[in-house]
Regions:
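Short, contiguous alpha-helical
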Residues: 7, 11-25, 30-80, 122-189, ...
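Short, contiguous pre-domain boundary segments
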Residues: 1-6
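Intrinsically disordered, low-complexity terminal tails and inter-domain linkers enriched
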Residues: 194-204
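Acidic/histidine-rich alpha-helical segments that form the ligand environment
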Residues: 80-120, 131-149, 153, 188-195
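Intrinsically disordered, low-complexity segments enriched in small/polar residues
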Residues: 62, 118, 198-200
């Protein structure tokens, strides 16, 4: 009974964070969903591509249930892995998000069909023999981590935060409130830095 509860709980969280991840692209231009927003090139549509490959492998191939569409291999092909993190001009947003949703359906079928202790094999892990529980936790963690990245990227673009439409202004706080909050945090950070510098300068050297 507890095993079934654990599987349903983890699966429910995965479904929720997937939708939040896709929502991060809503309302943005083609340029904004694709453009690099960090020095290493992190971008919103690339995160979707990466998570598609993650689920296709971990909740498909690992349990002998391969996703029927081509996905990049994780066998040391750096070029393929790099291409998995961004979208070319020939790849449409609808195509990439559509494939992600199809992977969801494939993953959901795997989760529904297998017991939480069903065995799998992840050859690139130090302990390659795993259970569905290990892999489900890993995929949930990976998706949540990248949803956090997406949250920051989206806020940088247009100030939108949260996990669904309306979250950004649900507390009734406007831009002036957040600018005041940011200024207060900046003031505190500078004050702490100044105090630390002064303390260091006044320290007696041995």
């Amino acid at each position: 009974m507890i095993d079934e509860f654990a599987k349903e709980y983890l699966h429910g969280d995965l479904r929720w964070i997937r939708e939040a991840m896709v929502w991060k692209l809503d309302g943005l231009s083609e340029y904004d969903v694709r453009r690099p927003l960090t020095p290493t090139g992190t971008n919103l549509l690339g995160l979707i591509k990466h998570l598609t490959t993650t689920e296709a492998w971990y909740l498909g191939e690992i349990f002998g249930r391969p996703f029927p569409e081509p996905v990049p291999r994780w066998d040391g092909d750096e070029a393929a892995l790099s291409a998995n993190m961004w979208a070319t001009e020939d790849e449409s947003r609808a195509e990439i998000i559509g494939r992600y949703r199809r992977v969801w359906a494939h993953s959901d079928a795997t989760i529904d069909a297998l017991a939480i202790d069903a065995p799998g094999h992840v050859p690139w892990w130090p302990r390659p023999d795993v259970k569905l529980f290990n892999v489900l936790v890993h995929v949930l963690t990976e998706t949540t981590r990248h949803a956090g990245h997406a949250d920051i990227l989206r806020e940088q673009l247009d100030g939108a935060t949260g996990v669904s439409a309306g979250d950004s202004d649900e507390l009734g706080r406007d831009a002036a409130f957040w600018e005041s909050r940011r200024a207060e945090i900046e003031r505190a950070a500078r004050a702490a830095d100044t105090a630390n510098t002064a303390e260091g300068a006044g320290a007696v050297k041995p």
